[in-house]
Amino acid sequence: LEFSRVLFRSKFVSEFLQKQQIKKQFGTYLSPAMVEKLQKNPELLALGGESRELSIIFTDVRGFTSISEHYGKDVQGLTKIMNRYMTAMTAKILENNGTLDKYIGDAQMAFWNAPLDDADHAKHAVKTALQMLGSLDAFNKEVAAEGVPPFGMGLGINTDTVVVGNMGSSQRFDYTCLGDGVNLASRLEGQSKPYHVAMVIGPKTNEYVKDTYFTLPLDCIAVKGKKEGVNIRSEEHTSELQS
């Protein structure tokens, strides 16, 4: 009987520590509901690197120079307004069960379909992008009353099989993804500016969402490392870049 009690306590402590580790590892990447699902189903989690098809978003602020000039030497003011912007955009990623990968200056990277499965990852990525643009409109109306210049946004969305998992050094690692598909998502975001659109969508993403969202062809672009050009499109409601 005593052995059974010890075994029970040991199992309880082990499960508790596992849940705490999952919360520590993914609490800043995922919504609370997603973290709880992982805690209840730790077998769904593959912490080693694995190949998975993901839908990846990169975002970047447009008009940052005007915003920075508005604040001048008020570094605290600039930091606060950027944090407000990032908070509003991140909320949409987490609400749609995306994984927030990282902030890169005033840019964001997020993806869908890892660590938990998401059969509609491409649709959720595009839905999130549209909601982010909607939130941007509301945010700009709010800060306009404070005399802040409007924020613009460029987004790139790509779907591809990439490597995802814990990556880094023995001192620090992050749950992230890498591969040509990730690089292309970043390049697509960069194409939003010269093509004067808010959102640029890659070919595989378009294949998955074409029955839900109407997209417009933009061009066939050359991409370093690829022999054939990449057909890029934009969602119909984002044909004009918000500056």
Annotate each PLM feature:
Residues 22, 34, 78-81, 85, ...:
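Helical mechanochemical/support elements of P-loop NTPase systems and associated helical scaffolds
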Residues 56, 108, 153-159, 232:
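A structural signal for short, well-ordered beta-strand segments
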Residues 162, 191-235, 239, 243:
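Cytosolic regulatory/linker segments at or just downstream of nucleotide-handling modules
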Residues 166-169:
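Cytochrome P450 core scaffold surrounding the K-helix E-X-X-R motif
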